[in-house]
Amino acid sequence: MKVTVENKKGLNKDIKVFIDKETMNSYMDEKYEEIKKTVNLKGFRPGKVPKEVLKRQFGQAIFSEVLDKVLKDTSVKALEDNKIKPAGQPKLDLKTYGEDKDLEYVMSITELPKVELKSVENIKFDEYSVKIDTNETDKRIKEIAKSQNNFKEVAADVRAVEENLVIFDYKATIDGKDFTGGEGKNTQLILGKDLFIKGFDKQLIGVKKNDEKSVDVTLPENYPQKEYANKKANFICKITEVKKSEEVKIDDVFAKNLGAKDLADLKVLVSKQINDEYKNSLDKLAKTQILKEIENFKVDEIPENLIEEEVKILSQGMTEEDSKKSRKNFEEIAKKRIKVGLILNEFGEQNKIKVTEQEVQAEVQKQLRMMPGQEKMVMEFYQKNPSALASLRGTVYEEKIIDLIKTKAKPSKKEISKEEAEKILKEHQKQDHNHEHDHNHDHDHPEEKKASKSTKIEKKPKPSASKKPSTKKVSKK
């Protein structure tokens, strides 16, 4: 194989590859020998079909298969031997090819630019620890206790008030006619939360057991059966039970039920949990600071093809007119994203950072925990969307790079109060929409839902740099 590299304008190169016909014929002979072992042709014993017969029967198909393999193998080798990293898929132009002929082709590529890695020890970022006072811990424990309240049935003549649990059967009609989904049994509502159809539960205030109550509402715009959306409906509700919540006593027994040794231990765990909530959000802010610092590193030139691909991603879902108006802004965002991505990749390669299959699966499991009850849907999504799984792998890779940078850099360590943390995060949230740092472009994730109350201890979400912290179980480290 002969390879000639011709430099074009900027990062563009033409790589000419020549393979003589003797080498091509040896590839063909290997393939014929491979096929001869398995092919069955009338009049010939298995493994004894002559090459000329195979050539007449399968020659064109075999050559196409061999050509694909040779192009793949030789193009990769040509790039590796010349230490060329392409930005995107190379374009192949076949000049000469065919059975019993030389193979000659030109591979046109845009090369990844040279990246100058500064010493990461110079990167500056803030590392916060949040001091949580006892009042905040006690407040959170009370909220947890409230979420654990038990409901006990009240006397048949007691009328329902806000925060009571009402259980009922219903039959609904639109313009006096039954409709799909208009019937329910043992429906449960906590009055005052307005979690069913808007304005529904307040009409049940004052009902008692065995009452029949008529409720008029307008079905929501996102009603599952679209033909009924925004229509007025009448619900005839048969009240089967009214229950009142009983406060849970906050003591050692309560703490043990939540997995703690005693109440004192629970306070330690909850305090740590609150601190972790803020830490997770503040860590995202630190990541943003690091990425902003990396923007100051030098990259000779940004490949135009990568900019174009990134602009297409940013323009997804927009009209052609809006896309044109935003073009200049999108190009600037694209250049920043690509530049930082190139630098992170170079840092990752130099430090031999790898992502294992176990780490990818751990990230998938993290996604599953965020969407309880929809685990099957999430798994199927990743199985059917390899690009989404690749994006997830990219997320893990970037996080490992950022974590390593944090260990090498010298952070400015600061202890702050909860109020100061909220102020910092709020300020960052205001600026967040102006700073794009999502280098993995995770456009393929399934729609996320908030975690349900399936864990023993529920967190109260706090403000964060980009979104509220997720619900997690309190655990000891």
From Swiss-Prot:
Cellular component GO terms, alphabetical: cytoplasm
EC number, UniProt record: 5.2.1.8
Domain PPIase FKBP-type span(s) in chain numbering: 163-248
GO biological process, alphabetically ordered: 'de novo' cotranslational protein folding; cell division; chaperone-mediated protein folding; protein transport; protein unfolding
Pfam annotation, one family: Trigger_N
Catalytic activity: [protein]-peptidylproline (omega=180) = [protein]-peptidylproline (omega=0)
Intracellular or extracellular location(s): Cytoplasm
Disordered: annotated span: 408-477
Keywords carried by this UniProt record: Cell cycle, Cell division, Chaperone, Cytoplasm, Isomerase, Rotamase
Biased composition (Basic and acidic residues): 408-461
Alphabetical list of InterPro entries matching this protein: PPIase_dom_sf, PPIase_FKBP_dom, Trig_fac, Trigger_fac_C, Trigger_fac_C_sf, Trigger_fac_ribosome-bd_bac, Trigger_fac_ribosome-bd_sf, Trigger_fact/SurA_dom_sf
GO MF terms held by the record: peptidyl-prolyl cis-trans isomerase activity; protein folding chaperone; ribosome binding
UniProt cross-references to PANTHER family, sorted A to Z: TRIGGER FACTOR CHAPERONE AND PEPTIDYL-PROLYL CIS/TRANS ISOMERASE, TRIGGER FACTOR-LIKE PROTEIN TIG, CHLOROPLASTIC
Swiss-Prot/TrEMBL domain comment: Consists of 3 domains; the N-terminus binds the ribosome, the middle domain has PPIase activity, while the C-terminus has intrinsic chaperone activity on its own.
Function statement: Involved in protein export. Acts as a chaperone by maintaining the newly synthesized protein in an open conformation. Functions as a peptidyl-prolyl cis-trans isomerase.
Family label: Belongs to the FKBP-type PPIase family. Tig subfamily.
The protein's name in its UniProt record: Trigger factor
Protein's organism: Pelagibacter ubique (strain HTCC1062)
